[in-house]
Amino acid sequence: MPTTHFDLTLDICAEDGTRTRYYQQDEHIGGKTLRQLVSPRLFNQPLLTLASEHSVSAIPSRTIDVILAHTASPPPLTLPPQWLDVAEVNGESFLEAAGPDESPEARDQTASVVEIHTRGGWMVLLRVELAIQATFREERQFLAHFSDLPVIPFRLLAGGIGLINPPNIGRVTVTPPLKGVSETALQADLLSCSRP
């Protein structure tokens, strides 16, 4: 009889650019931890507290940019209304999905690649699939209320889940451009972004 091995690695990516790693190999405790992580109110508590038989760590929630929970057994995600799926991608996988001759706009009108940069310098590239937007106003709402979300959950490319703390987002770039937004925005192409 084959045995399955459970492990959970948590990377806490902070606004000061540090990454702190935690590990859990007990399946029962790890499952409980994952269920607590997918709470939409995760970042509303003042401290994120992690404990083991060896130590207790408390991290101010406001200083956390991203949490990455690497595991082969991720829990289902609670997504914001109108969001159908959110998954980490690499840049080439989305652009090559339908072949070189199709434009991103022709591939899937409900999916966008969203590049999120946080205050701590962390970057996540996500494929966000939304319910079909009926009006330009609804498209504008997607971007306008991005930072109002309590948490942005997503599936990790290598297995597991990720959670972004929206108040710590420094920039969001959406491809293809949302028509309802691009027609009213300042007209300029993104060339580069660098840290001092």
Regions found by a protein language model. Name each.
Residues 20-56, 132-141, 148, 153-161, ...:
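A cross-kingdom feature marking solvent-exposed beta-strand/loop segments within repeated
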Residues 55-63, 160-168:
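Short coil-to-beta-strand transition motifs
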Residues 44, 90, 165-168:
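Detector for Asparagine
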Residues 171:
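Active-site micro-motifs of SAM-dependent methyltransferase domains
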Residues 1-20, 46, 53-55, 61-130, ...:
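Intrinsic disorder/low-complexity detector
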